[in-house]
């Protein structure tokens, strides 16, 4: 290697290249790692050096050389590359490897307008010194390379135009903790700050993108998911569109319920005009969604919901596909089709489904969610009423069209609205659930807005986080983690701003949280269980019972301290009804694990003191934030032992946790023979989870004789999901040959899954 090359330092000076210094940094980064070669990294990077190269480019070249060596046989390169990247990041942020004192850092960032000045108003210099003593900067060295790149690309406070970085990861974690507990009493708050900091910086609790990138900055909107219901009037349609623009500009993913909009050809003002139907208004919503990127962190994204019996359903089901022309397609949103038992019954009995415009059938739309018996009574009545415009379609044809579009686009989702209301924390008579969100894990009440400042409307918000099952040894640890997650997210509701009154009203009234899990596949592998063979059923029951029990207990304790949420009376919890009372009893045939916790005592305590939060759990996708914790995505099986994730920061390789010891214990996605075992597990989780679950269905066409997935199989899985009480289905993934070119490398759903959506974490 040419020792006489000149390099350009960060301050502009030039000097001869110092290969010893590079070697020392690499030796430091490789310490304690297995099966990594410093000379390999040096060889790969040296050939890319040139005269006059900047020292920062040398650093980036070495990092890239190490990252390119990450493989199934040498997974530790992900830590070597990460340590080098952390070194580089700290140099960029602080001009040196050693981080500055926390207090001085915060003062400087507040002066620059990067941090919220409330930090200096709420805490004294002395308290910052104490917080500084809580920080363990060496925890930066536990990140994988994929995690560091995600931090750099999405989470660390930075100037997105110039690329300047202003902080390191441990400052992010301690300051999120400081912001969230700033209103707690002075004598207890630093204890909570320390406990929360320890939980998030050791990856036991995983936080969503809006919290990681936003808390501590002057922008205060951190709810990941926003659910907006639209009424059947121009005023409401415009109010919905304004609300969408406000929220996509602030990092949120959107669920839109457009099911009330009347069908094409309906009379307006008693026949004075002829209605243009749903599609022009869906286009209007699509334009609103795409008008802003989510705070520079990701592009806007939405899922729009409508009932299966809508008169225009056959035109709506095809809106996403590649056929058709611009005029009859609205491709840049995803869609959720709403179904109930009556629709499934018609399918099973070979009957018809009758389609109506919601505007022609008084009471039917509301009953679809609030009262299944009343819905059936009205539906049959209107079917026999010759004065009402309608269309009959064979149920099997309509379901087949829906499943064909789900198969070809992967992005037609399913919401079983009866399960969402019968096994719900809300009383459907007063607070029916009429939609879900972008990624199908949220089930909350909404009311249409007539204008953006409508006091009577209700926009639902959900604030997310997750427990990392891979980072805990026993389920008992969940008790402390539940206390921290519930208290932090509950405090966030008071800490954040609400751009629209209808959102503030709902958030303050219901105080809804959605706490889920990541790293479930690792949890199964560690416990020697598999998705597909039933061996995980009892463990899953035990795990999710513990999660929901400890979350309810934490919210009940918080209610004793700070009062129940104001609209607690609209929940089923207020009547002493718990998830263990309303689950789908078909599950009892596939799981025989008894209940392990004292639910009766909890029931009494909830009836007496209430809950601080109307909902506590939801199982969301976690494509991005699971990379920070080096965890598997949500509840999903991994696609490969090494996954390749494309993000705007380039290709990131990530190896499944503890690969060397557990490689034979993991069950990969395409090794599962069918969806049955997975759907059973989702049903068992749904027994306890009070909101919903982003559950996917997966198909490998090569497993079928014709090389195509038969419609019969798609419908069978849809009915299996319904039978086990599954509320929602998210993606449908179809295996194509491309991802098998290298058997250990699996591209994950690209990181714009959910268009890199916000209701993931």
Swiss-Prot record:
Keywords: Allosteric enzyme, ATP-binding, Deoxyribonucleotide synthesis, Disulfide bond, Nucleotide-binding, Oxidoreductase. Residues 5-95 form the ATP-cone domain. GDP binds at residues 209, 437, 441, 623-625. SUPFAM superfamilies: PFL-like glycyl radical enzymes, R1 subunit of ribonucleotide reductase, N-terminal domain. The keyword Acyltransferase does not apply. One of its GO terms (molecular function) is ribonucleoside-diphosphate reductase activity, thioredoxin disulfide as acceptor. This is Ribonucleoside-diphosphate reductase 1 subunit alpha. It holds the Pfam family ATP-cone. The record marks 225, 462 as: Important for hydrogen atom transfer. InterPro entries: ATP-cone_dom, NrdE_NrdA_C, RNR_lg_C, RNR_lsu_N, RNR_R1-su_N, Rrm1. GO terms for cellular component: ribonucleoside-diphosphate reductase complex. DTTP binds at residues 232-234, 262, 269. Under complex allosteric control mediated by deoxynucleoside triphosphates and ATP binding to separate specificity and activation sites on the alpha subunit. The type of nucleotide bound at the specificity site determines substrate preference. It seems probable that ATP makes the enzyme reduce CDP and UDP, dGTP favors ADP reduction and dTTP favors GDP reduction. Stimulated by ATP and inhibited by dATP binding to the activity site. ATP binds at residues 9, 15-21, 55, 91. S.typhimurium produces two separate class I enzymes. This one is the functional enzyme during growth. Tetramer of two alpha (R1) and two beta (R2) subunits. The B1 protein is a dimer of alpha subunits. A radical transfer pathway occurs between 'Tyr-122' of R2 and R1. The lineage of its organism: Bacteria, Pseudomonadati, Pseudomonadota, Gammaproteobacteria, Enterobacterales. Provides the precursors necessary for DNA synthesis. Catalyzes the biosynthesis of deoxyribonucleotides from the corresponding ribonucleotides. R1 contains the binding sites for both substrates and allosteric effectors and carries out the actual reduction of the ribonucleotide. Belongs to the ribonucleoside diphosphate reductase large chain family. It comes from the Bacteria. It catalyses: a 2'-deoxyribonucleoside 5'-diphosphate + [thioredoxin]-disulfide + H2O = a ribonucleoside 5'-diphosphate + [thioredoxin]-dithiol. GO terms for biological process: deoxyribonucleotide biosynthetic process. The active site is at residues 437, 439, 441. It is an enzyme of class 1 (oxidoreductase). The record marks 730-731 as: Important for electron transfer. Disulfide bonds join 225-462. The record marks 754, 759 as: Interacts with thioredoxin/glutaredoxin.
